[in-house]
Amino acid sequence: MLAKRIIPCLDVRDGQVVKGVQFRNHEIIGDIVPLAKRYADEGADELVFYDITASSDGRVVDKSWVARVAEVIDIPFCVAGGIRSIDDAAKILSFGADKISINSPALADSTLITRLADRFGVQCIVVGIDTWFDDATGKYHVNQYTGDENRTRVTQWETLDWVQEVQQRGAGEIVLNMMNQDGVRNGYDLTQLKKVRDVCRVPLIASGGAGTMEHFLEAFRDADVDGALAASVFHKQIINIGELKAYLAGQGVEIRIC
């Protein structure tokens, strides 16, 4: 059995790490490189960096900080933000990233997933899915350009359909960003995770809602996700990664102990 992964998420805007609630009202957390090093030292299994306004601004993630992060950490990390071509991805990987993640650009052109997977291998290609539960319809819908609340829009895709589509296109991993839960720290949306897990054959990462160690346990035990991504509980030092891993191991979760 592969070990479950604990993954801090660093949302980047204007060269700094920020954090919002339900993808809105972002506050500045701190500088990118020191936070990355802190999480690596605490025992994170990997890191994810999202340049949250790159896609909506029509630009590619700033590669200068990617190189600086690669110099100070020795764990895998994934970078996302406005990647629209093989050349964009190649440059980010050449600066030291281990994976690249695409979200809004994949919704604009789903063939991008296949082209990237063919060039770099599926293990390198992550698709992020920003999903919102609509109380009126009782369905989960995929959103686009979520880094800018003034440009965010609901797409034609229902979440489960898009999960299946990106796998067929060549996604090697899926990060499910559950927008309703984001930043509120009352637990992952287990109902949605279970539905997605039923149709997801590639590694599935839960994102949005972690507030306690028990929330991580529930995601691993009840929804069988491969990794759990979180931000505010780590940024605000509510949960220490080493202590979290010790707790999960004590509950029988296969986890890498540092």
Swiss-Prot record:
Task: Tell me yes or no: is Lyase among this UniProt entry's keywords.
Answer: yes
Which pathway does it take part in? Amino-acid biosynthesis; L-histidine biosynthesis; L-histidine from 5-phospho-alpha-D-ribose 1-diphosphate: step 5/9
Its function?
IGPS catalyzes the conversion of PRFAR and glutamine to IGP, AICAR and glutamate. The HisF subunit catalyzes the cyclization activity that produces IGP and AICAR from PRFAR using the ammonia provided by the HisH subunit.
SUPFAM superfamilies per UniProt: Ribulose-phoshate binding barrel (SSF51366)
Query: Where found?
Result: Cytoplasm
UniProt lists the gene as hisF
A Pfam family annotated for this chain is His_biosynth
**What does the subunit comment say?**
Heterodimer of HisH and HisF.
**Principal place of residence:** cytoplasm
Task: Could you list this entry's UniProt keywords, alphabetically sorted.
Answer: Amino-acid biosynthesis, Cytoplasm, Histidine biosynthesis, Lyase
Task: Name the EC number(s).
Answer: 4.3.2.10
- Identify the catalytic residues: D11, D130
* The protein, known as: Imidazole glycerol phosphate synthase subunit HisF
**Reactions accelerated catalytically:** 5-[(5-phospho-1-deoxy-D-ribulos-1-ylimino)methylamino]-1-(5-phospho-beta-D-ribosyl)imidazole-4-carboxamide + L-glutamine = D-erythro-1-(imidazol-4-yl)glycerol 3-phosphate + 5-amino-1-(5-phospho-beta-D-ribosyl)imidazole-4-carboxamide + L-glutamate + H(+)
**Lineage per the UniProt record:** Bacteria, Pseudomonadati, Pseudomonadota, Gammaproteobacteria, Enterobacterales
* Database matches in InterPro entries: Aldolase_TIM, His_biosynth, HisF, IGPS_HisA/HisF, RibuloseP-bd_barrel
Family, according to the entry, reads as follows:
Belongs to the HisA/HisF family.
